[in-house]
């Protein structure tokens, strides 16, 4: 896989152990060779924002508002406990069975000439999860594409373009409020992502929309720790579609593994 400044974020966050990133914001973790972590103010100043003004952490995870960013910072810098599905207040952050079978979305006409690439990649990326769990159905509603924003209440989420982002794509979790439920895609970076196909990149992002965290937040990865708000579903899988390759991952193309399939099936049937 060729070296590039922007990594799947699928992100330009600077993990100190990652050779794929040359610049980026400070991490809230202790830096090698030091006894200090950055202050919240330092962390806040160095955290990127997306066009909607949301902070982007852990590569492709949006956080709305300074108070929520502070909660995230404190969770990362506080004591690690044994608490990979996202959790909110100790509960799995997943869709209800009925909603999981009706995950409607639109693809914005603003993608222009690149729209068909996104439509096709969303369909094939969604298909990877749907084939693994009978309780999941992503439903494309093209009639909503002309008004495809988070304000459209006719769909669960929107897929919209972004330019000059510090990530290839970013998504949301089931617990996100409706104004935050969109998948943003930088098409130029998506098309230049090397071994990471558009299908696999968008499947990774759709994994987040189903409630799945980055696999490398687990201690077995040895780097790129994010926080403790998760529950393991399967044994650690360094080749997971949810594992950044630059965080001691063993997959070069973000393909889905059997452990990924078993994990999603354990939640969505």
Language-model regions, residue ranges each:
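Disordered inhibitory propeptide/activation segment of secreted metzincin zinc metalloprotease zymogens
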Residues: 29-117, 229-234, 266
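Short, conserved helix/loop micro-motifs enriched in His/Cys and acidic residues
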Residues: 96-111, 179-191, 240-245
């Amino acid at each position: 896989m060729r070296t590039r400044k922007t990594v799947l974020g699928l992100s330009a966050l600077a993990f100190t152990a990652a050779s794929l990133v040359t610049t980026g914001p400070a991490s809230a973790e202790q830096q090698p060779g030091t006894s200090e972590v950055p202050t919240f103010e330092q962390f806040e100043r160095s955290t990127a924002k997306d066009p909607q003004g949301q902070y982007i952490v852990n590569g492709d995870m949006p956080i709305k508002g300074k108070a929520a960013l502070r909660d995230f910072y404190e969770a990362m810098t506080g004591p690690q406990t044994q608490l990979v599905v996202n959790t909110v207040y100790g509960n799995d952050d997943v869709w209800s069975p009925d909603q999981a079978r009706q995950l409607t979305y639109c693809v914005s006409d603003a993608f222009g000439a690149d729209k068909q690439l996104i439509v096709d990649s969303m369909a094939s990326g969604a298909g990877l999860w749907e084939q693994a769990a009978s309780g999941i159905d992503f439903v494309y509603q093209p009639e909503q594409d002309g008004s495809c924003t988070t304000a459209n209440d006719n769909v669960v989420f929107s897929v919209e373009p972004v330019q000059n982002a510090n990530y290839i794509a970013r998504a949301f979790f089931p617990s996100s409020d409706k104004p935050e439920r969109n998948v943003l895609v930088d098409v130029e970076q998506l098309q230049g992502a090397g071994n990471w196909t558009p299908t696999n990149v968008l499947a990774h992002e759709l994994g987040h929309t189903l409630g799945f965290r980055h696999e490398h937040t687990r201690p077995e990865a040895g780097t790129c720790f994010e926080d403790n708000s998760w529950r393991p579903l399967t044994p650690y899988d360094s080749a997971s579609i949810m594992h950044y390759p630059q965080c001691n991952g063993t997959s070069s193309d973000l393909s889905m593994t059997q452990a990924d399939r078993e994990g999603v099936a354990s939640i969505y049937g």
